[in-house]
Amino acid sequence: MGNTSFILASIGVFLVVILLLVIILLVAKKYLSPSGNVNIEINGDKTINVPQGSSLMTTLNENGIFLPSACGGKASCGQCKVQVLEGGGEILDSEKPHFTRKQIKDHWRLGCQCKVKGDLKIKVPESVMGVKEWECEVISNNNVSSFIKEFKVALPPGEHMDFVPGSYAQIKIPAYDCIDYDKDFDKDLIGEEYIGAWKKFNIFSLKAHNPEPTVRAYSMANYPDEGDIITLTVRIATTPFLPRPQVGFQNVPTGIASSYIFSLKPGDKVMMSGPYGDFHPNFTSGKEMIWIGGGAGMAPLRAQIMHMTKTLHTTDRELHFFYGARALGEAFFLEDFWELEKEFPNFHFHLSLDRKDPVADAQGVKYYEGFAVNCIRDTYLKNHEAPEDCEYYLCGPPMLIKTVTDYLDSLGVDQESIMYDNFG
């Protein structure tokens, strides 16, 4: 009996202590957490009254001002830059790698890291003020190579996006419990031509999980004259393979955004905002233009090239496009560029494939055997009279960007003449 009373008394004391701790936490939250509304003055001519507590990027997003963010607010892409002229506190260590000392002195911050805790005066690029968000409808979502989708969405009726070729859009990725590659991916949309690779590498065994909403950025492959159907090229980000000779996948999460997009079907709805970015052609310089790309980096380069030719009918500038792929079956939109070569004598398309390709040989497709940077060097620039006088537009995997920029630097090409859209 005595032991029972002691146990009950102990439980009672424990519950009282827990209750007191909860009360203390609630009181502390009330007095220490930001509460009430504050004012944010934007570009000196607009003020919004907003609740405290969220990041500046989230707060602006909720008020129709969409800062670019390719990483979903993780401080890794460094794109959500904004000047915080008053308020905001000290810059965080997570932000400093994205800015020069002069930019830090000029009060530049990352919107995803700056918390709204009081009145602010900020300055955002005027281009951001023109960004809109829409609920779009998926029109098609078909593979154009083994692991890349041509993802097309339609803007709502009557809506239009004004953009410069080379811009990108952002897709909202909702939280989801599980996307099962085998059950949730439409195998007909992957296509008979490519599904063998998925089975070979056991990719349908993968699953994806996303505990919280985020956003991802994708360059647009369409050019303005193609209307209000937005085309993105999206590569599936699978879990990395184990090092050989091991078989299987590493214990690393799959790509939450690409998994979501690959699961979408015609008729589905998706939230998209845009346009973003400054990877745009120089329309007036008169210089020779050279585009270099690989993989899903095709998207903004196609948009720029099609606009320069089909829309602007540029015939007074030399135009060259170098595109690299592992094999002919992994290259896409090729017909567009073969047709341009016929229509525009000043446009030249150079396809490079990593190794000898029997399929390309059987079809009589002209290609360079080797990597894109070697193709540029061996077939064109090594005999070019003045490579430093050309403009270069690059988009593709980081290794491609690095090897090409290193090579161009060795030729004496100024950094100002090299524009690129780098992605991982």
PLM region spans:
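Residue-level marker of beta-strand positions
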Residues: 55, 79, 168, 266-269
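Reductase modules of NAD(P)H-dependent flavoproteins
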Residues: 2-73, 84-105, 310, 315-424
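Ferredoxin-reductase
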Residues: 139-266, 352-356
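A short, basic/flexible loop-to-alpha-helix module at the beginning of a structural domain
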Residues: 260, 273-287
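Fe-S ferredoxin-like electron-transfer domains
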Residues: 20-27, 97-159, 179
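Cysteine-centered iron-sulfur cluster-binding motifs in ferredoxin-type domains/subunits
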Residues: 68-78, 111-115
